[in-house]
Curated annotation (Swiss-Prot):
Matches recorded under Pfam families: A_deaminase
Protein name listed in UniProt: Adenine deaminase
Source species of the chain: Stutzerimonas stutzeri (strain A1501) (Pseudomonas stutzeri)
Site residues (Important for catalytic activity), renumbered to this chain: H218
Co-factor(s): Zn(2+)
MF term (GO), any: zinc ion binding
GO cellular-component term (any): cytosol
Transmembrane segments: none
Binding site for Zn(2+): H14, H16, H194, D275
Catalytic function, reaction form: adenine + H2O + H(+) = hypoxanthine + NH4(+)
Record keywords: Hydrolase, Metal-binding, Nucleotide metabolism, Zinc
Length: 316
């Protein structure tokens, strides 16, 4: 079943480039940039990946991102991810890029964006993988910071097609970012947002009604609100679900408790994604395999999930 799932053509719609930074590459970049890491070796770093919640993960994620300094670093990061896409027959990807993670520590916006864009262009030309980049705002920072990031990005408007919202969800509702999302839409950008991962169903309503999103990232807590589920089905709003991430961050205590197949059978347009694969133990194929092994996902269900991901693409 692993090979069959691996060969299934699919799209990935929920992937943080910084979260695909494998320990080996992190150490290589640290050496290149003469940065001392707080771990002695790759194995020590891997054992640090045993975090228990979103905040513990984010602390590690931001520490790891510190090795990304130059345009070449961002190219290498993105290219490594695209090679993994090729291995797993991910034919289209719409990754997130968090500029604030880098500009706040002095990395020039254009260095990061140019490196990522060059790799995505090579992915299209050399690997045949289509893509579109999503500029994502960090929700634990003020909306004013998101406005600054959008202003920085607009001269490079053709490099990305949408804006998103990620980072610590609890206490940072989508409503906090309504004005900056209005401005982004005014510039012709599409919108997506993380909602209903650790936050309540109300955050999903806000993302739909205030941020006018085309897609909900995560969204698994929608299951707690029957009216919301009915709306997601009626409007066929895609959810970019990340099963291994959800269990690693204890959104579900165990994969056997995950609700993605229940949502699928109800008619919700759910998709399978890897989120931060270097940290959560698997890329898209490993997420499909986990659903098969823990939930008994059938070939027919896998086909529907893969087709959903292709249908839910926003970048063409």
């Amino acid at each position: 079943m692993h090979d069959w799932l691996n060969n299934l053509p699919k799209a990935e719609l929920h992937l943080h480039l910084e979260g695909s930074l494998e320990p080996e590459l992190m150490f290589r970049l640290a050496e290149r940039n003469k940065i001392a890491l707080p771990w002695n070796d790759v194995e020590a770093l891997r054992s640090a990946y045993n975090f228990g919640n979103l905040q513990e993960f984010l602390d590690l994620y931001y520490a790891g991102a510190d090795v990304l300094r130059t345009e070449q670093d961002f190219y290498d990061l993105t290219w490594a991810y695209l090679q993994k896409c090729e291995e797993q027959n991910v034919v289209h990807t719409e990754p997130f890029f968090d500029p604030q993670t880098h500009t706040d520590r002095g990395v020039p916006f254009e260095a990061a964006l140019n490196g990522i864009s060059a790799a995505l262009a090579d992915g299209r030309e050399l690997l045949g993988i289509s893509s579109g980049l999503i500029l994502s705002f960090l929700r634990h920072l003020p909306e004013e910071e998101a406005f600054k990031t959008l202003e920085q990005a607009l001269p490079y408007r053709n490099a990305f097609f949408a804006v998103g919202l990620d980072s610590s969800e609890v206490g940072h509702p989508p409503s906090k970012f309504q004005r900056v999302f209005d401005k982004a839409r005014g510039e012709g950008l599409l919108t997506v947002a993380h909602a209903g991962e650790e936050g309540p169903p109300e955050y999903i309503w806000q993302a739909l009604d205030l941020l006018k999103v085309s897609r909900i990232d995560h969204g698994v807590r929608a299951a707690e609100d029957p009216k919301l589920i009915a709306r997601l089905i009626e409007e066929q709003i895609p959810l970019t679900v990340c099963p291994l991430s959800n269990t690693k961050l204890k959104v579900f205590a165990d994969m056997r408790q995950h609700n993605i197949l229940d949502l699928l059978e109800q008619g919700v347009k759910v998709t399978v994604n890897s989120d931060d694969p270097a940290y959560f133990g698997g890329y898209v194929t490993e997420n499909f395999v986990a659903l098969h092994e823990s939930l008994g996902m059938t070939e027919a269900q896998a086909r529907r999930l893969a087709q959903n991901s292709l249908d839910a693409r926003l970048a063409y």
